[in-house]
Amino acid sequence: MRLSHLGKILKSKLADRGISLNKLSRETRIPMSRISVIVNGKRAITAETALRLARYLGGSANVWTNLQAQHDLAVTMRRVGKLINREVMRAVT
């Protein structure tokens, strides 16, 4: 399963609402440098950033953190999933 990086999702939500990255930075007090690396797919969304985005955009911080976790798991599965399946045997009960 291929999931979009949260930066793409954030950028899309902002575009739909006509909110610039600069405005998001000013009104959430998230540094512009952090927003820039998030929307460019170079950094994950932290719990604090999720709280700030949820407060500003509405909804729950859990949505942002859950999407981030799903993305991270998908990336890790592509990177090392086969190796883990070979190295780790299921526990026998």
Predicted regions and their residues:
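Short alpha-helical DNA-recognition segment
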Residues: I19-N40
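Short, basic-rich loop-to-helix N-cap that marks the start of a DNA-contacting helix
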Residues: K42-R55
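A short, Lys/Arg-rich alpha-helix, primarily the initiator
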Residues: M1-I19, N66
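Short glycine-/polar-rich loops that comprise or flank the Walker A/P-loop
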Residues: G59
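A generic structured-segment signal
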Residues: K13, R34-I38, T46-E48
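Short, charged recognition helix plus adjacent turn
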Residues: R55, V63-T93
